[in-house]
Amino acid sequence: TKSRYRNRRSRPRRRYGRRMRKTRCRRKGRRISRRPRHTTYRRRVRKIVHLKRRSRPRDEIDNLKVKNNRRLNESLKQHRLPMRVPV
């Protein structure tokens, strides 16, 4: 069993309020949906955690990359100067 009195050397990290509790162990690449829950359901309903992109199947990731690249190219085309200036 755990000792009843915590080790004095390790100071407990102070967190204030619900917001700090909510974001305590949110890891990188993992988003928690901001759907508000009624307080009575809070203990029963787990937070909806969106999957990391890395855990998706490979082809889906490739599709995402293609989509993002296309979008980026389109936005770059708008800002690109014309190559040949008409004389």
Swiss-Prot record:
<dbReference type="GO" id="GO:0005634">
    <property type="term" value="C:nucleus"/>
</dbReference>
<dbReference type="GO" id="GO:0003677">
    <property type="term" value="F:DNA binding"/>
</dbReference>
<feature type="region of interest" description="Disordered">
    <location>
        <begin position="1"/>
        <end position="36"/>
    </location>
</feature>
<keyword id="KW-0744">Spermatogenesis</keyword>
<keyword id="KW-0544">Nucleosome core</keyword>
<protein>
    <recommendedName>
        <fullName>Spermatid-specific protein S1</fullName>
    </recommendedName>
</protein>
<dbReference type="GO" id="GO:0030154">
    <property type="term" value="P:cell differentiation"/>
</dbReference>
<keyword id="KW-0158">Chromosome</keyword>
<keyword id="KW-0238">DNA-binding</keyword>
<dbReference type="GO" id="GO:0007283">
    <property type="term" value="P:spermatogenesis"/>
</dbReference>
<keyword id="KW-0539">Nucleus</keyword>
<keyword id="KW-0221">Differentiation</keyword>
<comment type="function">
    <text>Involved in nuclear basic protein transition: histones are replaced by spermatid specific proteins which are themselves replaced by protamines in late spermatids.</text>
</comment>
<dbReference type="GO" id="GO:0000786">
    <property type="term" value="C:nucleosome"/>
</dbReference>
<keyword id="KW-0217">Developmental protein</keyword>
